[in-house]
Each structure stands twice: as structure tokens, then as C-alpha cells.
């Protein structure tokens, strides 16, 4: 996955959804921190869709313990041919935790995999200038800078969309979205402004973040909006 155009990922903790996801998704995001035996799942995987692996630590809203094993698992996952991208937290790459996330980024590049550098705010959305600054830092570490924040108002969504458009115009690859009810529509609208990645579960009951649409709905909405743009 090179993310040169919009890529819709089916977010899941179970690679068994691949046949159903194939209808609407361009790839899968395997949430290793939510999954049972994620490395065994990768060993058994014979699907067609490429995979982005995420092993989110508890301090960034996930369920993985902040141990060297979290990064070791990502590095092992990258040995699988189907894994063509990895998500690493901006804070980890800038020194949060006691372990070297940079080695995973290096391993990904050695294998020709893309690096998505992510940052999250589960409480609020900063102003546009702060969003741009955060995403620029993320882009400096990886191929795509990803930011998800919680919107409390339409103004928060406008700040995120404005930052997305600004950075896209500068040639950066970013993936952006606002979480929560006030920001839900951003998941469909942000690709029109340049966001390169969307995330959605096949089944809405399996959402991995607040405000996610199900996969088929998001594919339809994005397709309609992009065709009108």
C-alpha cells in the first residue's frame, strides 16, 4: 500500500473477515492489540487484501502493554508478505515509552512497507495551526501522517479539514478524521480534502474508534462525494 490515492481499510481484529471486506475495502487494518493470536492469524492468512498492522499501546487508546514485545510483534508481522504497511505512534517515535519504535520503521522500509505515523486526541481537537504542526512532525517520520481527534463542534471539523487541505496542497500524505458524533461526517468528507486513508469495520458492532461508519456505508459515501468533487 503506497497511499498515493484514497485507501479504505477494513479495521478488524480478525483476518477471517477478509472475504466479506474484499467487496468494499482496499486493504485491512489488523488491530493486533485487540486480536487473539494476531501472529498466528497472519501465519494462516491467505486472503487477497494487503494488511496494515497496528499494535496500539494503552497510552494511545489501545490495549497493548508498553513493552518491547509490542514492537517485536510488529517487526515479526512485517515478515509476512501480506503486510505492506505498519502504524507507529508519533509519540513512540519521538521517545515516549522505553523502547525504540524507530527500529520498526527501519524494518518496514527495508521490506518496502509503508509507515503510517499516527497521533490521537480523545478529548478535543486543537486549532488548525496545531493540527498542521502535529501532522508535519508525523510526516517527517513516515510516509503518511495520521491524526484523529475528538470533535466537540463543527468548528473542530473545519480545523481538521483545513489542515488536511493545506498539507495535501504542500505535497504531504495525511490521513485525518474527527471522532465522536460531532465529527462523524468527517470520515466521509475528509478524503475530498486529501485524506489518504479511511477506516471502517465490516460490521458496525465491531467499530474500533468512536463514530466509525460501517465499511459498505463509508465506501458509498466517499464514492459519492469524490464523484461530485
Swiss-Prot record:
InterPro entries: Aldolase_TIM (IPR013785), DHquinase_I (IPR001381), Type-I_3-dehydroquinase (IPR050146). Keywords: Amino-acid biosynthesis, Aromatic amino acid biosynthesis, Lyase, Schiff base. The keyword Membrane does not apply. Its EC number is 4.2.1.10. It catalyses: 3-dehydroquinate = 3-dehydroshikimate + H2O. Gene3D superfamilies: Aldolase class I (3.20.20.70). GO terms for biological process: 3,4-dihydroxybenzoate biosynthetic process; amino acid biosynthetic process; aromatic amino acid family biosynthetic process; chorismate biosynthetic process. SUPFAM superfamilies: Aldolase (SSF51569). Involved in the third step of the chorismate pathway, which leads to the biosynthesis of aromatic amino acids. Catalyzes the cis-dehydration of 3-dehydroquinate (DHQ) and introduces the first double bond of the aromatic ring to yield 3-dehydroshikimate. PANTHER family: 3-DEHYDROQUINATE DEHYDRATASE. This is 3-dehydroquinate dehydratase. The lineage of its organism: Archaea, Methanobacteriati, Methanobacteriota, Stenosarchaea group, Halobacteria.
